[in-house]
Curated annotation (Swiss-Prot):
Protein name: Olfactory receptor 4E2
GO BP term, example: detection of chemical stimulus involved in sensory perception of smell
GO cellular component: membrane; plasma membrane
Residue positions binding Cu cation: H105, C109, R260
Length: 313
């Protein structure tokens, strides 16, 4: 409580992506379009999964949860970034900064755990297909999703606690477009080396260990594909390569940023764009929208809408 009582900073000022007004307007238009595509693409997947019985499978249950997480994850940072691109002075209150930081880590950690679950789902489906219905039943799926949200909440509470326990009484300039633990604790009026080590132990270890676990699972899948038919091999390779692309795009920036205590590079802002803006956009296209089952479901939904419209005209 003493640390909190010593807090003097009431707001933080973002430097944003650039100080060039022309570039800011271009970025605003580009990121606005990306955000709209992110929302629409992920919402379409959720709707298709809910209203199409053929998609009521564990994999699409997890992917619809991924779409929900991507909507939330991008909504934590992108709207504030767009506001900053329009305004000359880019500020955020201390409380809102901590709130943004909490939800950023909640949704990011939930996505990390969900990507592990998706990898495990593919491992069971491809390597032990006969046991798949028993291993990945709906009860297990719901328990896994509950566990990932619980794990994400615990992680985020830990990161938030490490941040707010420090006194902030001096500089308030954040060289980014959003609040994150490594960026905020550098502004604390005390030595943060130990806190930085704890952050690496928390975020860095989670990112790196989970990435290695996912890579290992896909390597096991690739080895087991030798036992499958050529058609089955091709389908599994297509699915796994798409999944691994998302894993690399998301885990790469996280590992780059969260495994370095007390160090930062000018490229960090660009790297952050990948996992806060780009990955939530690409996930629906890489995972599902190019999938024939999802395309068929989308077509059925359009036909239902056409029938609904015609019946009232």
């Amino acid at each position: 409580m003493d640390s909190l009582n010593q807090t003097r900073v009431t707001e933080f000022v973002f430097l944003g992506l650039t100080d060039n007004r022309v570039l800011e307007m271009l970025f605003f238009m580009a990121f606005s379009a990306i955000y709209m595509l992110t929302l629409s693409g992920n919402i379409l997947i959720i709707i298709a999964t809910v209203f199409t019985p053929s998609l009521h499978t564990p994999m699409y249950f997890f992917l619809s949860n991924l779409s929900f997480i991507d909507i939330c994850h991008s909504s934590v940072t992108v709207p504030k970034m767009l506001e900053g691109l329009l305004l000359e002075r880019k500020t955020i209150s201390f409380d809102n900064c901590i709130t943004q930081l909490f939800f950023l880590h909640l949704f990011a950690c939930a996505e990390i755990f969900l990507l592990i679950i998706v990898a495990y789902d593919r491992y069971v489906a491809i390597c032990t297909p006969l046991h798949y219905p028993n291993v990945m039943n709906m009860r297990v799926c719901i328990q896994l999703v509950f566990a990932l949200w619980l794990g994400g909440t615990v992680h985020s509470l830990g990161q938030t606690f490490l941040t707010i326990r420090l006194p902030y009484c001096g500089p308030n300039i954040i060289d980014s477009y959003f609040c994150d633990v490594p960026l905020v604790i550098k502004l604390a009026c005390t030595d943060t080396y130990l806190t930085g080590i704890l952050i690496v132990t928390n975020s860095g270890t989670i990112s790196l260990s989970c990435f290695l676990a996912v890579v290992t699972s896909y390597m096991v899948i690739l080895v087991s594909l030798r036992k499958h038919s050529a058609e089955g091999r091709q389908k599994a390779l297509s699915t796994c390569s798409a999944h691994f692309m998302v894993v690399a795009l998301f885990f790469g920036p996280c590992i780059f940023i969260y495994t370095r205590p007390d160090t930062s590079f000018s490229i960090d802002k660009v790297v952050s764009v990948f996992y806060t803006v780009v990955t939530p956009l690409l996930n629906p296209f890489i995972y599902t929208l190019r999938n024939e089952e999802v395309k068929s479901a989308m077509k059925q939904l359009r036909q239902r809408q056409v029938f609904f419209t015609k019946s009232y005209t």
